[in-house]
Design a protein with these regions (language model features):
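Acidic two-metal-ion nuclease catalytic site recognized across multiple nuclease folds
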Residues: 2-4, 163-187
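Glycine-rich, phosphate-binding/catalytic loops in enzymes
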Residues: 43-46, 111-113, 153
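Stable alpha-helical structural segments in soluble proteins, enriched in small hydrophobic residues
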Residues: 73, 77, 81, 149-158
Length: 187
């Protein structure tokens, strides 16, 4: 059975990697929107138990999703993070977010009033049957290091993203790291 509780077990003044157990992933997610570009974007910061940090971003311009502006990016970021965790074999993910709907639509504390938020809540609840999803609200724009990085990454997603990327797994990032190390060694 899915657990929908914001445990908030990772104190902000602690190094997140020191608070993660094996098999757990911590993800900071955020969304952004630029009216001039007519695009929404998302940013994810993944922190692994061994201290490695990976980022991912993307954007979209679906007309129905544009109506939700940055909220579409917020939802995409949370969904991308859970899919990444599932693809990588994690048993649990904690999603840190600054927009309340990310948690409250899933838990039912807020009613999903449109098709987009209904699909988001339904999808996340389904995934919650496969992986433990925990939510922690962090204050927006309050100098929480990784939340600020997720915000910057979401803005990059709007401006520089090439659509919504295929959801990777940890092995994809590890392969890219190995290739980069080999290239650096060759230079």
């Amino acid at each position: 059975m899915a657990q929908w509780q914001g445990l908030g077990r990772y104190p902000e003044n602690a190094d997140p990697k020191d608070c993660l157990a094996a098999g757990e992933l911590l993800a900071y997610v955020d969304g952004s929107y630029q009216d001039a570009l007519k695009k929404y974007g998302f940013g994810c910061i993944f922190i692994l138990p061994d201290g490695r940090i990976y980022t991912e971003y993307g954007n979209g311009d679906n007309p129905d999703s544009l109506k939700q502006r940055n909220v579409s990016g917020e939802m995409l970021g949370a969904m991308y993070a859970v899919r990444f965790a599932l693809n990588s074999g994690f048993r649990a993910i904690e999603i840190r977010y600054d927009y309340e709907g990310i948690e409250k639509w899933v838990t039912g504390a807020w009613k999903s009033k449109n098709e987009l938020t209904q699909k988001y809540a339904q999808t996340m609840r389904g995934w919650g049957q496969k992986i433990q999803i925990r939510f922690t609200k962090v204050p927006a724009h309050s100098k929480v290091k990784y939340n600020e990085l997720a915000d910057e990454t979401a803005k990059l997603g709007v401006a520089n993203g090439n659509g919504i990327p295929k959801v990777k797994s940890l092995s994809d990032f590890e392969a890219a790291d190995a290739a980069e190390r080999m290239q650096d060694a060759a230079e």
